[in-house]
Amino acid sequence: MIENLRNIAIIAHVDHGKTTLVDCLLQQSGTLDRKSQGAERIMDSNDQERERGITILAKNTAIKWNDYRINIVDTPGHADFGGEVERVLSMVDSVLLIVDAVDGPMPQTRFVTSKAFERGLNPIVVVNKIDRPGARPDWVIDQVFDLFDSLGATDEQLDFPIMYASALNGIAGEDPDSMSDDMEPLFQMIVDHVSAPEVNSDGPFQMQISALDYNSYVGVIGVGRITRGKLSPNTQVSVVDRDSSSRNGKILQVMGYHGLERIEVETAEAGDIVCVTGIDALNISDTLCDPAAAEPLPPLSVDEPTVSMTFQVNDSPFAGLEGKFVTSRNIKERLDRELIHNVALRVEQGDSPDKFVVSGRGELHLSVLIESMRREGFELGVSRPEVIQKEIDGQLCEPYEQLVIDCESEHQGGVMEELGQRRAEMKNMVQDASGRVRLEFIVPARGLIGFRSMFMTLTSGSGIMTHVFDHYGPVSKAELAQRNNGVLVSMVKGKTLAYALYSLQDRGRLFIEANVEVYEGQIMGLHSRSNDLVVNPTKAKQLTNVRASGTDEALILTPPVLHTLEQALEFIDSDELVEVTPDSIRLRKKLLLEHERKRASR
């Protein structure tokens, strides 16, 4: 049985098609029955994953092919969710690296691949989207080889097998010019090149928890790979945590995977990936073992967070009108619940009881959490993201990121000038025949805060940017570019009127339309100059009986700029907050009253 088991993780850059490939493998192996074949990207089960088109949580699935059972784990491509990636690699024996046939390997591919090499895993390279116009498989393979070499791969890792595929059409082959009609060659390659798990199924039971799930019916569900022995339901075990203290527990159910379903099994043996229930207060990296032989496995390590934000109770005049959960106790309980399964997150008490400093791997990591809370009915105020500085050998250091930009060559000058002001250092520049250019930079992480929205404007929306944590380096003394413009701030509480907004739109770009309730201290728009301007958006036209009716001109308002959550977080300055409620995202000053702001600025 164990010889026919294969555990493999899938690595790919965002949008290179790994989730589509898994769907294709599930369907062609006959693991999925007809009823669930309709949905696309079956693996991305969470709402936000479908909307953003990214994978956030690592997922497991099992495929039966001929007599083999292949456990496949889908990993997130974003470095922001690197906490997920590192744990997943502890469960597998090889990785499937998926690369786009046009783009080649991108920085996030680099991040996950380096983690795989650290664990000594041998990759299989799949060049996907081979049917795209402009596919250049030979160039991509050279790039992959250079990438592996620069990451210090061994000779064995550099001698990687290559498969060409188009997941959308469901075909694969070892030669891009002669593809087979289905995914058979890929299944065969996985079976031939991935070794069966090297485990001892006769010794005392031992497994490490590498992911957690929660179900209100059975409580906490631990997911992990059995490293030794066998496991059946209703077994007594010892739970050893990362501080080596142990306690006893009893496993109630043991579940294996079949396709995307979890099915209860009577017995599971070493090498298989299973879920267990019945043990309270499980943590990631706990070891479950036979009480007679309680040996903990080494704890899993996760990279440190690099970005922090303050979450606070919403104290605006509109607090509590839209959300269900508004108190600091609600927010604290929700953050504590998130900490159980979101390993890369840290939460500390802020400088007052209703503030919490939440640190994560990047802006995306935290904005996904805020968006989830918003949908659950929470209201909160969120401050601008800040980078976390560390002291290394007596010197203050800050995180630096590797940034890769793909844009039209006509936009190159503007992008480079903007990055120059943000203290970016250019490492490489490659032009391709189609008039696009790829730029690589090393840039301080705080220089990237707020850059994405700027970048989209500079490249008219046609640029692609990706970045990943590179290293901690000395803090750069120079000032980084900040937002140049001030904002328009409301001086009164009330309903906005078209008459007032019409005269304000010459002063800058508005964020709010007519007939919307606003409050004093709320940000109405971006001022065209560098100072903040206090305005009255509720001013009505003075009516007199002198004028004849019908002489008023029609007021034409420019449509307002509406921010998404990420854009709002990037836009605000250090004295501003984003007010997040289930129905709206508002920008506001930390101090709502003008005389308080004046006093604070002295």
Language model: regions and residue ranges:
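Structural and coupling elements of P-loop NTPases
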Residues: M1-R602
